């Protein structure tokens, strides 16, 4: 018999230890649930409300943040992972696929590929769940595509009352806007409909370019392809520029990768361990060696190597090792100033042996501006650039600049685009590497450029910007988040207030405020709400 009415006992575990992919934190929830149906999710939420318990929903655990840490109830939807329906456009321009929200993105890839469809745009990995990938603002890198959530047609949510709520642009649009980037604080997404397109391959060019080449060509480089990203190696003063367009050409063998081999990977991680634990000053030399092994030494701008890959292989990437990650978004037009400032700071820090950075520093863009209305062109082809929108609503907690204005694809310039800069510090063989000095400087630089942090990453903040109880500086671990409540309230303003209003309406008993400290110190809830 189940220990919880309406939920099979096989879907409940005690003494479960949840660890995130990076191994930065773990949690021991009181109960760990893996429901198999929407009815079971409803039963869990209602029981939590009645018993005064709180719930965190987890998926693949790929967020390096501790936002999901809890010692109360934890729900994982890996067993709620079926495909429910595929509705195809009569003209074959797109299809709407409805899935249970626990399905992983890579599982959805397999289903869609077998039927000749693909997701329109992807982030760097496909391990996340369909419900989780939108909950923190996942994005790819393109001057035409925005947040992954813009592909979603509708959602079904189990809110804090234990009610099933259907959401789309016409039904509860305010709740839909909150749920498309909810941080798990509204309820549990149990079902989603996603707009997909006919499967396509990507013809990409990968070039080694000098750092100054990137800056000199900043005005045109970001709108030169539908998909584009750049990896910056400051100690080599070079970048790797990857650009891709849709194609009907057949896929070929993927590019060779030195660190993709067993030996190359082991050598790289071992050298990183040496720089972290024995001799930090070796870091620039190690990074130069690694760059030469992977990419060579010669600039190939305008003459890069080409490849044709499936959209999945082209857009996903190898994230290498366990890592701390701090990513911020700011207007793309501020990019040259930001990169020059970071470049100077990194060089000065290395010269003074103050701190050393790991590479690459990932530089990406997105177009999160939205038209007032959209109709898919009658003559849209498989290789046509740009999105087929699932909805035209901006999530309240979207961290990209809100003042940017939409332009048709033919008129897109840097003025429509958001710049994402991603600072990564590896944890070789699980070793915690110091990050505080580098990430603090990084955050100060991006904040001054109109930036805001990615919700799911390792942003630190400071005791001056946190809310709730704070400790003295020497009581914090180097990598521990301090909080950014005052800044977040300033940045998001009325959008945050509207999100909080929706959250209170959908979860009046605070069932989904499990990690209270994280939510308070980052301004998602006010501390007095916990006493109400």
UniProtKB/Swiss-Prot annotation:
Pathway: Cofactor biosynthesis; D-erythroascorbate biosynthesis; dehydro-D-arabinono-1,4-lactone from D-arabinose: step 2/2. It catalyses: D-arabinono-1,4-lactone + O2 = dehydro-D-arabinono-1,4-lactone + H2O2 + H(+). The keyword NADP does not apply. Its cofactor is FAD. Its EC number is 1.1.3.37. One of its GO terms (molecular function) is D-arabinono-1,4-lactone oxidase activity. NCBIfam families: FAD_lactone_ox (TIGR01678). PANTHER family: D-ARABINONO-1,4-LACTONE OXIDASE, L-GULONOLACTONE OXIDASE. This is D-arabinono-1,4-lactone oxidase. It comes from Eremothecium gossypii (strain ATCC 10895 / CBS 109.51 / FGSC 9923 / NRRL Y-1056). The lineage of its organism: Eukaryota, Fungi, Dikarya, Ascomycota, Saccharomycotina.
């Amino acid at each position: 018999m189940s220990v919880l009415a309406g939920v099979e006992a096989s879907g409940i575990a005690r003494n479960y230890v949840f660890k995130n992919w990076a191994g930065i934190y773990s949690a021991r929830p009181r109960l760990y649930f893996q429901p198999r149906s929407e009815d079971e999710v409803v039963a869990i939420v209602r029981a939590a409300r009645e018993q005064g318990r709180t719930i965190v929903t987890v998926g693949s655990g790929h967020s390096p943040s501790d936002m999901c840490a809890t010692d109360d109830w934890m729900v994982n939807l890996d067993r709620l992972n079926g495909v429910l329906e595929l509705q195809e456009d009569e003209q074959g321009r797109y299809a709407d696929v409805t899935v249970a929200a626990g399905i992983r993105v890579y599982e959805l890839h397999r289903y869609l590929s077998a039927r000749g469809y693909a997701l329109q745009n992807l982030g760097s990995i496909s391990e996340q769940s369909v419900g989780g990938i939108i909950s923190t603002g996942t994005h790819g890198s393109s001057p035409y595509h925005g947040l992954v959530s813009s592909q979603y047609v509708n959602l079904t949510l189990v809110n804090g009352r234990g009610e099933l709520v259907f959401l789309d642009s016409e039904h509860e649009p305010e709740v839909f806007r909150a749920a498309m980037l909810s941080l798990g604080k509204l309820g549990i997404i149990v079902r989603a409909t996603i707009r997909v397109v006919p499967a396509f391959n990507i013809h990409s060019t990968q070039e080694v370019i000098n750092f100054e080449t990137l800056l000199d060509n900043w005005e045109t480089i970001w709108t030169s392809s539908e998909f584009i990203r750049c990896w910056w190696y400051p100690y080599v003063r070079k970048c790797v520029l990857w650009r891709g367009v849709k194609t009907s050409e057949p896929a070929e063998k993927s590019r060779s990768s030195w660190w993709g081999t067993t030996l190359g990977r082991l050598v790289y991680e071992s050298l990183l361990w040496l720089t972290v634990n024995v001799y930090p000053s070796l870091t620039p030399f190690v990074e130069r060696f690694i760059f030469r092994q992977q990419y060579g030494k010669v600039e190939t701008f305008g003459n890069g190597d080409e490849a044709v890959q499936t959209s999945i292989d082209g857009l996903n990437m190898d994230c290498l090792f366990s890592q701390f990650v701090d990513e911020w978004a700011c207007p793309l037009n501020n990019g040259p100033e930001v990169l020059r400032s970071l470049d100077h700071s990194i060089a000065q820090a290395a010269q003074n042996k103050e701190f050393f950075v790991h590479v690459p520093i990932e530089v990406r863009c997105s177009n999160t501006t939205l038209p007032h209305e959209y109709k898919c062109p009658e003559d849209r082809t498989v290789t046509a650039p740009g999105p087929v929108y699932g909805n035209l609503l901006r999530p309240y907690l979207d961290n990209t600049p809100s003042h940017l204005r939409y332009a048709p694809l033919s008129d897109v310039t840097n003025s429509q685009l958001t710049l994402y800069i991603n600072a990564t510090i590896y944890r070789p063989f699980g070793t915690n590497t110091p990050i505080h000095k580098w990430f603090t400087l990084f955050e100060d630089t991006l904040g001054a450029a109109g930036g805001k942090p990615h919700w799911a990453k390792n942003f630190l903040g400071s005791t001056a910007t946190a809310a709730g109880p704070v400790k003295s500086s020497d009581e914090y671990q180097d990598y521990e988040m301090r909080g950014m409540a005052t800044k977040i309230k300033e940045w998001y303003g009325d959008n945050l207030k509207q999100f909080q209003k929706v959250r209170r309406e959908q979860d009046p008993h605070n069932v989904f405020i499990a990690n209270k400290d994280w939510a308070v110190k980052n301004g998602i809830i006010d501390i007095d709400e916990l006493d109400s």
